[in-house]
């Protein structure tokens, strides 16, 4: 399910349409308003993909796990597929082979062959989180693996597709399927996306409110953490040379297909890196001070309001007593 994924929808569609065929893609739109995104969805629909428009509310976004599980079950009865992958718009399907990462359909089919008809919940092996400041570099994670199903197995899904149940058994099987995940966009777009994902549960985006929501560890709490992070801290951690692995297979496939991907990365600064980071640090410090001042003013205004209300109530009490006595 996607909404207004301005820089990711076209690469996602082009890559998976080439890999799997557009007729095998089902795209759930959650009420996009962007003209370019709506046009991209219409093109995808005319090229053979199925675009589902009716789930457009915030509530439906929160309940997407059960909604998509029901959709898979209906497909199982009417138009079954061998496998069902639950992909977000920032996730790109690939596989791990003996010779490395592959983005080729024949290798993915070979990896999936032993899982045809599986009764288990199927899990991907890794996620490759991309580095938005350095092309071809990824952080590999094994935590919170995404789920997918073979035909007939889907029973239930959570919102993030990390936890699932099979209607045919209670086992889990780790496969050699992997996802490339482009969660981290250029900083400005990353903030817009995080705010959008949080808007179904938060209306106050002040620093004080975001910190309180983050501590609750509630729905999409990681988006609050993203919004609290300044650009200096954001960029600096991606420039750290430690913890990254080179994996050129996906962008090589993008080049082969003709997919533009420059917008998925932070624009290269014309300044020397040390100077760029120094300026970003100063800017971040100033912005945080402004946030603290706004928070102080907000708390001061609330205190004044409470005091004023209390004084008004006290001053009205004699008048009310006199009115009652006079009546």
Locate each region found by the language model.
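Catalytic-site signature of metal-activated, phosphate-bearing donor transferases
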Residues: 65-66, 95-287
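Acidic metal-phosphate-binding loop of nucleotide-sugar-dependent transferases
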Residues: 89-93
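Short beta-strand/loop segment that forms part of the nucleotide-sugar
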Residues: 22-32, 54-57
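Short, acidic, metal-binding catalytic loop of nucleotide-sugar glycosyltransferases
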Residues: 14-23
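Boundary detector for helix-to-coil junctions that initiate low-complexity/charged tails
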Residues: 271-327
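Short acidic/polar active-site loop segments enriched in Thr and Asp
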Residues: 22-23, 82, 122
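Active-site beta-to-alpha loop of glycosyltransferases that engages the nucleotide-sugar donor
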Residues: 1-14, 31
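Active-site-proximal specificity loops/subdomain of glycosyltransferases
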Residues: 37-86
